[in-house]
């Protein structure tokens, strides 16, 4: 289904003026951007001679109070629109306005005194701009849903704008021309997607919600209101009639009343207000501030500086003397150094006054300090190394020390090159026969050393390197102690204490030497002999392996 639109009937003066007014209100609604120096005006509007083609693709629902359909629109006509405005060409003005919008509400008159007032850089510099839109090509598919209670809804399935030509007074500048082209294409795309459906929906609600009875009632109320304004006088409202209870809280009113009552006194010592400088104390306050110009003249014996008289006295005395820096190039370094020292001293004086005259806390780190000797002299034994039960510290200096192992010895000893001759003890007279069970190996704790006559390797010797148990006086596998164990006296010589070796040291060299003998001992464990060979070997004087040989048989 399709139909033609008589496009020539739109070229009327009333429709053109109404469209211009509607577009002007729509373009100037809301907050104006800071880049524009004036409002937007419709300079020229022409619908052209060629109208769009409108085609209905589908009608989903059709009734007296509702309608839903899908349509297609195509337009390639000679419609053109010309806009006129003024653009702000001062970038500093634009930056200042944007900063005020982000940080301070510039529409509030109470905030004007805290904002800087620039002179030349803040002046507007407006340039006229004429923007012409022509050669518009539109091709889109939309959905229309109408309801008498919900109004008219228009939604496009795609972006209907195909192309548009933008020409302006800045076409000679290619960068600005490209920028305007891209920006306007984006804005017209948003117009078809969001702005146009919203405007059509709001406009439809305005007319569909009013029936004949409601419209007549509204018209009668408007007429009566206009008549009352002409005949009746307006009532005057005094300040006493204003109820401030809803505008101000009781807490704020109480605080303001206390501040007001504190000043209604003839007392000279008026209580001070926090973070407030009163005008009556302003001169005293300015006297305590450092005067940069006078201090420079006093310290460096410089001539007086001529500063602009329009500046306030406090700012005049404390500003950096530009004329002094320009006229004294030879003494520039000294002047800057003096200014830095004055500012530093002023900062520390202010800091000390806030801290009631106390100096600021500084973190002090002392490097290369001497170690105290009191701790070492008081506890000299603390410097000796402490070792645990399983300590494996090594004493390389004790080369003569050996380690003993508890081993199972064979009843028969093999011929060895390093056998040691031990003296045979005299047999004791027994009252009965002593029988020895030679079938089981004898568990002994013999300790072989390089010198059999030396007593230094005895477990009771103080210089022995044998393994010890934990604690003083603990015998190693039930060895009896022949001498009383006593602790050593406390020595004050630090060198001897530092070089003192513990009894728990193990000589690795001796362990490595004994590993060769341990291989032969393992072979001894594999041999097994009978009782006859055992007694024969024990009676021979050549084999003295046992520490205590069995006594010969006796008859009683």
Curated annotation (Swiss-Prot):
Lacks alpha-helical transmembrane segments, suggesting that it resides in the membrane via beta-sheet conformations similar to those predicted for other outer membrane proteins and porin. Keywords: Lipid transport, Lipid-binding, Membrane, Mitochondrion, Mitochondrion outer membrane, Transmembrane, Transmembrane beta strand, Transport. Component of the ER-mitochondria encounter structure (ERMES) or MDM complex, composed of MMM1, MDM10, MDM12 and MDM34. This is Mitochondrial distribution and morphology protein 34. It is a multi-pass membrane protein. It comes from the Eukaryota. HAMAP family: Mdm34. One of its GO terms (biological process) is mitochondrion-endoplasmic reticulum membrane tethering. GO terms for cellular component: ERMES complex. GO terms for molecular function: lipid binding. The gene is MDM34. Component of the ERMES/MDM complex, which serves as a molecular tether to connect the endoplasmic reticulum (ER) and mitochondria. Components of this complex are involved in the control of mitochondrial shape and protein biogenesis, and function in nonvesicular lipid trafficking between the ER and mitochondria. MDM34 is required for the interaction of the ER-resident membrane protein MMM1 and the outer mitochondrial membrane-resident beta-barrel protein MDM10. Its main location: mitochondrion. InterPro entries: Mdm34, SMP_LBD. It is found in: Mitochondrion outer membrane.
């Amino acid at each position: 289904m399709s139909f033609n639109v008589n496009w020539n009937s739109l070229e009327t003066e009333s429709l053109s003026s109404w469209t211009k007014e509607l577009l002007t209100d729509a373009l100037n609604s809301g907050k104006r951007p800071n880049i524009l120096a004036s409002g937007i005006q419709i300079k020229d509007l022409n619908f052209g001679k060629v109208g769009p083609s409108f085609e209905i693709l589908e009608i989903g629902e059709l009734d007296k109070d509702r309608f839903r359909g899908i349509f297609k629109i195509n337009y390639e006509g000679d419609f053109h629109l010309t806009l006129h405005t003024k653009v702000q060409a001062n970038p500093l003005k634009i930056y200042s306005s944007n900063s005020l919008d982000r940080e301070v509400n510039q529409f509030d008159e109470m905030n004007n005194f805290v904002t800087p007032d620039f002179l030349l850089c803040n002046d507007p510099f407006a340039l006229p701009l004429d923007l012409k839109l022509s050669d518009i090509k539109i091709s889109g598919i939309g959905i229309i849903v109408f309801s008498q209670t919900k109004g008219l809804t228009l939604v496009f399935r795609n972006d209907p704008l195909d192309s548009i030509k933008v020409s302006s007074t800045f076409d000679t500048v290619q960068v600005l021309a490209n920028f305007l082209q891209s920006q306007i294409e984006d804005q017209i795309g948003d117009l078809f997607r969001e702005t146009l459906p919203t405007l059509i929906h709001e406009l439809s609600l305005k007319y569909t919600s009013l029936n004949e009875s409601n419209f007549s009632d509204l018209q009668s109320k408007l007429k009566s209101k206009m008549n009352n304004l002409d005949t009746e006088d307006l009532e005057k409202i005094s300040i006493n009639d204003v109820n401030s209870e809803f505008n101000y809280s009781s807490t704020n009113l109480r605080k303001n009343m206390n501040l007001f009552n504190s000043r209604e006194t003839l007392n000279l010592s008026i209580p001070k207000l926090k973070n407030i400088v009163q005008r009556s104390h302003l001169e005293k306050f300015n006297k305590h501030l450092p005067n940069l110009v006078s201090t420079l003249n006093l310290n460096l014996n410089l001539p007086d500086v001529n500063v602009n008289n329009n500046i306030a006295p406090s700012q005049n005395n404390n500003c950096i003397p530009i004329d002094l820096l320009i006229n004294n190039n030879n003494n520039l370094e000294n002047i800057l150094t003096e200014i830095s020292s004055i500012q530093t001293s002023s900062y520390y004086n202010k800091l000390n006054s806030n801290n009631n005259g106390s100096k600021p806390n500084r973190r002090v780190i002392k490097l290369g300090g001497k170690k105290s000797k009191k701790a070492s002299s008081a506890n000299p034994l603390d410097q000796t190394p402490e070792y645990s039960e399983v300590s494996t510290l090594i004493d390389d200096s004790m080369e003569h020390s050996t380690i003993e192992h508890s081993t199972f010895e064979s009843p028969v000893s093999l011929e060895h090159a390093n056998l040691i001759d031990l003296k045979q003890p005299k047999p004791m007279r027994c009252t009965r026969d002593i029988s020895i069970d030679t079938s089981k190996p004898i568990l002994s704790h013999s300790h072989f050393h390089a010198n059999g006559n030396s007593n230094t390797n005895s477990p009771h010797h103080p210089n022995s390197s044998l393994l010890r148990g934990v604690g003083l006086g603990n015998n190693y596998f039930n060895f009896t102690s022949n001498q009383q164990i006593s602790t050593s006296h406390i020595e004050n010589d630090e060198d001897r204490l530092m070089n003192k070796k513990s009894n728990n040291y193990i000589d690795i060299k001796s362990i490595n030497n004994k590993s060769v003998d341990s291989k032969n001992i393992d072979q001894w464990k594999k041999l097994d002999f009978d009782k006859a060979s055992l007694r024969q070997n024990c009676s021979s004087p050549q084999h003295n392996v046992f520490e205590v040989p069995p006594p010969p048989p006796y008859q009683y």
